[in-house]
Amino acid sequence: MKLFKNLTVQVITAVIIGVIVGLVWPDVGKEMKPLGDTFINAVKMVIAPIIFFTIVLGIAKMGDMKKVGKVGGKAFIYFEVVTTLALIIGLFVVNIMKPGAGLDYSKLEKGDVSQYTQNGGQGIDWIEFITHIVPSNMVDAFAKGDILQVLFFSILFGVGLAALGEKGKSVIDFFDKVSHVFFKIIGYIMRAAPIGAFGAMAYTIGHFGLDSIKPLASLMMSVYITMFLFVFVALNIICKLYGFSLWNYLRFIKDELLIVLGTSSSESVLPRMMDKMERYGCSKSVVGLVIPTGYSFNLDGTSIYLSMATVFLAQVFGVDLSIGQQITIILVLMLTSKGAAGVTGSGFIVLASTLSALQVIPLEGLALLLGVDRFMSEGRAIVNLIGNGIATIIVAKSENEFDEAKSIEAVEGMKKMKTAV
């Protein structure tokens, strides 16, 4: 019985039961959607305040504004380099495996993507994107849970609080206590993670069914193989270069990975990841700056999917993309994959923008992806989560803001828990 008190076991069991319910009783599975939605909403309820307090405390305690700029600069350079690497790996594998070759477009099931292509074909409005980052109303930014707007306000508030020096110490102490309250709340919410994972998985299988993925199984297989290679080859090499174990890190965040697998949302574990990265040895200031920005700008899994989906559609329509056109895909996605972050249906908006820039692949090809997109979202979310944690560790290490002793203690503690179970 002690085994079933472990969150990992609970989530795995919930996901398996969800799959069974969705397959055997699809109508019942469809009715389970509110369970997953309610859990994700509960997490989203505390995301904005947790981001605010973590960033403000991190900047205020760091004090040195030059260091804040340095951490932010290193994070953005890392994000751009690694997401570009993900795009290149995606293109390389899709050109070798050719999952779209031989598929007959006219015989494949299609969905309605008009809501994504109406504006997507015109590309991302960069002026609107930049102006949107600055909130016109602070309360509205928190109410909507807009991560970029909350991030912008939090950085300004943290800089202002740090500038007060000793006068701001009482505010820092108060915020520190309040932040602990919010992390306590997220701890309570996470006890319901198995229920949320069950509901989300039962709905996914019940609503979409496994039949919808059969025609495009080659694309799914190619994407998942690429994600596996990216994590266990590319990211593993990066981890070794910076002197830490990918395996220990993955074992440390296994609960979060399973929750993301069940809910298909990396946002569902954002607060827990911030707490976990601190416990793993990263300083609060680095965690506060890197994790939230990574959720918008360091989307490794999404980058892999977008590059592969673009070439896949070209293969379906028999379009032979030149090296120059594939370089254009990388350049366009380097920008648009960040520009549409956090927007509902952003994957389709970005794909529409990319196809529009190339002007050789019909936009209606996006309709092919609707049936399998939901089954690839788990992979995207998991790789995004893994990538953001690794980015945080690397930036912390490069700034001497990583506590090796704390990291060893966290890993040893995890091993003791495993032995106890």
Swiss-Prot record:
A Pfam family (short name) is: SDF
Q: What induces it?
A: Induced by succinate and fumarate. Expression of dctA requires the DctB, DctS and DctR proteins and is decreased in the presence of malate.
**The keyword Aminoacyl-tRNA synthetase is annotated on this UniProt entry:** no
Q: InterPro entries of this UniProt entry? A: C4_dicarb_transport, Na-dicarboxylate_symporter, Na-dicarboxylate_symporter_CS, Na:dicarbo_symporter_sf
| One GO term (biological process) | L-aspartate transmembrane transport
Topology of the protein relative to the lipid bilayer: Multi-pass membrane protein
Q: Where is the signal peptide?
A: none
Any one cellular-component term (Gene Ontology): plasma membrane
- Where, subcellularly, is it found? Cell membrane
GO molecular function terms attached to this record: fumarate transmembrane transporter activity; malate:proton symporter activity; succinate transmembrane transporter activity
Highest taxon listed in the record's lineage: Bacteria
Q: Which UniProt keywords apply?
A: Cell membrane, Membrane, Symport, Transmembrane, Transmembrane helix, Transport
Q: Which residues cross the membrane?
A: 9-29, 39-59, 76-96, 145-165, 185-205, 219-239, 316-336, 348-368
UniProt xrefs under PANTHER family: AEROBIC C4-DICARBOXYLATE TRANSPORT PROTEIN (PTHR42865:SF1), PROTON/GLUTAMATE-ASPARTATE SYMPORTER (PTHR42865)
Give the family from UniProt.
Answer: Belongs to the dicarboxylate/amino acid:cation symporter (DAACS) (TC 2.A.23) family.
What role does it play?
A: Responsible for the transport of succinate and fumarate, but not malate, across the membrane.
Q: What is this protein called?
A: C4-dicarboxylate transport protein
